Amino acid sequence: MSARVGSAARVLVSLLAIAVVAACGGGAQPDQQRSGSGGGFPVSVTGKFGTTTVPEKPVRVVAMSWTDADFALALGVTPVGIAKAPDSPNGLEPWTAAALGDAKPTQFSTVGSDPIEQVAGLAPDLILATKDYNLGQSYQQLSQIAPVVTYAGAPNTDSWQQALGNVAAALGLAEQGRKLTTDTEAQIAAQKVTHPELTGKTFSYVVAPTAAGVYTVNSDQDVSAQLLAGLGMRLSPKVLTLPTSGLPGRAQLSLENLSVLDADIILVAAASQQDLDAFAKNPVAESLGAVRRGAYVPFNYTTAVSIAFPSTLSLRWAMTQVVPKLSAAAKA
């Protein structure tokens, strides 16, 4: 995402800032509306910064985040420019790279700010920025280049269903967007049916453990928690009662208080394997029932990102990576 860089410190901040959604519904929210979205043009989409009108079918699309690129690619549209995923050596998350195939769009960095001149040089006729964390500073300049599809509230509060719907409408592919949403939701629901062992299992989810302590998800409105809920699991009641830290949807715990994390399954996402190993070897963590049973599921950075910044592409990838590990933990 635009707010992330490759350094370990900023990677940790990114994990801590994993999105907390305002609502999990798939339709457009009251503050973001679409008109003319049946496939004809012009199309209007209203978002945080006003109403964006797309006068005709776009042919040169620029994606200001890899999630926006995912939305376009899933709809069969290959952007001419894509913001780099800073944690990846080739600038692409694996699911994005797979969808691109042999296509090689221009990549650009959005670390710290959006590259206005580089975007302008791509001569876009549509800019997708539903997950652009720099947009508050760059919208006015970007909107002078081409119509900009934005978020309704914030890049981390619009659901993936809502963002996909707006991107699809702007591309004149509203019906395809609705089908993608339905198909992806059905795939998640099918995993729940296939893996009944997950239903009712409690979980806690630690993000960015350090030598000083950990942050843990304490909101069932967190997007990752919602995905797991869609599989039949539920966030541990013990962590739901923890006081929120300065990061929304996150509680902070010192290492000596890790016992509150015990649940049927413990998930841990970290920026490096070293951090994951350090958590697992902590004496208090080792004493947790879930860890002793083998119901401890470590997530590397890419896996955490796939469910923290969801798109139809990332979620389908995540199902192949996450569900088998959860199933094994549930049976431990």
Label each residue range with its predicted role.
Residues 19-23:
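C-terminal motif of bacterial Sec signal peptides marking the signal peptidase cleavage site
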Residues 62-64, 68-75, 177-239:
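Basic- and aromatic-lined ligand-binding clefts that recognize polyanionic substrates
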Residues 68-118, 131:
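A short, structured surface patch at a secondary-structure boundary
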Residues 87-91, 135-137, 153-166, 200-227, ...:
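Extracytoplasmic ligand-binding site segments that recognize negatively charged/polar headgroups
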Residues 116, 123-129, 147, 258, ...:
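Proline-aspartate-enriched helix->loop->beta-strand connector
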Residues 261-332:
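Structured C-terminal subdomain patch of bacterial secreted/periplasmic proteins
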